Amino acid sequence: MSHSVKIYDTCIGCTQCVRACPLDVLEMVPWDGCKAGQIAASPRTEDCVGCKRCETACPTDFLSIRVYLGAETTRSMGLAY
């Protein structure tokens, strides 16, 4: 299953998304673009299951991190309705 995790420059470096991820897909890396001096990164997207807990945990109202589900997941979710 392939999902895409996008981190945007509105990240405030709070680490909430990293702590919310049950599979350690995310990590913080140095970045001078915010006061915290760090930004979330997603080096292990192949482990992402698309639970979107990182999105829910983000205090910037989904403006900093988004999980785009792969087509296979989107199709199977449609069958549930």
Curated annotation (Swiss-Prot):
Catalytic activity: reduced [plastocyanin] + hnu + oxidized [2Fe-2S]-[ferredoxin] = oxidized [plastocyanin] + reduced [2Fe-2S]-[ferredoxin]
Keyword Membrane belongs to the record: yes
Gene Ontology MF, one: metal ion binding
Membrane topology, from the record: Peripheral membrane protein
Needed co-factor(s): [4Fe-4S] cluster
EC numbers on record: 1.97.1.12
Primary location group: membrane
Biological processes, Gene Ontology terms: photosynthetic electron transport in photosystem I
This protein's record includes keyword Iron-sulfur: yes
Enzyme class: oxidoreductase
PROSITE patterns hit by this protein: 4FE4S_FER_1, 4FE4S_FER_2
InterPro entries: 4Fe4S_Fe-S-bd, 4Fe4S_Fe_S_CS, PSI_iron-sulfur_center, PSI_PsaC
Annotated positions binding [4Fe-4S] cluster 2: 21, 48, 51, 54
Gene Ontology CC terms: photosystem I; plasma membrane-derived thylakoid membrane
Keyword terms, alphabetized: 4Fe-4S, Electron transport, Iron, Iron-sulfur, Membrane, Metal-binding, Oxidoreductase, Photosynthesis, Photosystem I, Repeat, Thylakoid, Transport
Compartment list: Cellular thylakoid membrane
Cofactor mode of binding and number, as noted: Binds 2 [4Fe-4S] clusters. Cluster 2 is most probably the spectroscopically characterized electron acceptor FA and cluster 1 is most probably FB.
4Fe-4S ferredoxin-type domain ranges (all copies): 2-31, 39-68
Pfam families xrefs: Fer4_7
Effect recorded for residue 27 to R: Decreases assembly onto PSI cores in vitro, FA and FB seem to assemble normally
Annotated [4Fe-4S] cluster 1 binding sites: 11, 14, 17, 58
Assembly notes: The cyanobacterial PSI reaction center is composed of one copy each of PsaA,B,C,D,E,F,I,J,K,L,M and X, and forms trimeric complexes.
Primary role: Apoprotein for the two 4Fe-4S centers FA and FB of photosystem I (PSI); essential for photochemical activity. FB is the terminal electron acceptor of PSI, donating electrons to ferredoxin. The C-terminus interacts with PsaA/B/D and helps assemble the protein into the PSI complex. Required for binding of PsaD and PsaE to PSI. PSI is a plastocyanin/cytochrome c6-ferredoxin oxidoreductase, converting photonic excitation into a charge separation, which transfers an electron from the donor P700 chlorophyll pair to the spectroscopically characterized acceptors A0, A1, FX, FA and FB in turn.
Alphabetical list of PANTHER family matching this protein: PHOTOSYSTEM I IRON-SULFUR CENTER, PHOTOSYSTEM I IRON-SULFUR CENTER-RELATED
Protein name: Photosystem I iron-sulfur center
